[in-house]
Amino acid sequence: MNVHQVLSGAGPVDAVTTQALAFRELFGAWGWGGRDVAASIDPRVGDRVKPLRALAAAGGDVLLIHYSAYAPKLRGVLELPQRKLLLSHNITPARWFWDHDPQAAVQCALGRRQLPEFAAAVDVAAGVSLYNARELGGDTVIPILFDPAALGPARAADPPPGPPLVLFVGRLTPHKRQDEVIRAFELYRRRHAPDARLVLVGSPLNDRYRAALQGLADELAPGAVRIESGLSREQLAERYRCAHAFLCLSEHEGFCIPLLEAFHFGVPVVARAVGGVPEVA
């Protein structure tokens, strides 16, 4: 049996790409073949994900479409005769981006508008969480594949002694509300732990948004907040091992893989119960 995976885009630190590659390993263990293709590819994953034009599916093959972004180039896949499964990873509502990145807002708006068309054209439409599945009008869930071993060993004891370290991991974007994380941290620091530190780990929406977060941090908690991007897997694991708490105040999440990572490292989690977050716990 062959299962071909189709993505709108593929990159080395993209959660959807990570999931697709995890599925490929699982399919291989089951003796299933197939190819992974994407409409756009970061060269760093070019050895594992091929251009969309490389898709060559036979009659009995299955196409697994990972839906996470506006993907007009994937419309042609819907016309193929093979059986098709759509897996929705969720697209953030555009309202969160208009004031910060209008182009991203347009892409999100188009992606959410296109989703029903794709869902209606496949044999099965599912979500990576019940929250996502219900956006499709159903309740079929294909769970996130999570391999704790890939993160490295959990810490053997409590975090190292020293000032409390609060951690956030995830994209630095408006809907994830790092601004509220900074404000909550400042309140905690002022009332309970003047020497506490906050580390925000993730790639920013753009330089302007990163600067806005840094400006807020410098205003409310000068010298106590650090923003980090582009960490290696080992560096990220070390941030988790040193953390005293993980704080997530996102207002839109289809799932939230960093919560699973925090659980793996034994870090206490405080998270706003929205979207797919309650399903993680």
Outline where the language-model segments fall.
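Glycosyltransferase donor-sugar binding loop
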Residues: 39-42, 197-211
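Membrane-proximal helix-turn-helix segments that form the acceptor-binding/catalytic region
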Residues: 92, 104-124
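Conserved donor-binding/catalytic core segment of Leloir-type glycosyltransferases
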Residues: 126, 157-176, 182-185, 199
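Carbohydrate-associated surface elements
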Residues: 131, 145
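Nucleotide-activated donor-binding/catalytic signature segment of Leloir-type glycosyltransferases, i.e.
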Residues: 202, 210-237
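Short alpha-helical donor nucleotide-sugar binding micro-motif in glycosyltransferases
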Residues: 238-243
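Aromatic "clamp/platform" in nucleotide-sugar-dependent glycosyltransferases that forms part
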Residues: 251
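Short hydrophobic beta-strand element within catalytic cores of glycosyltransferases
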Residues: 268-271
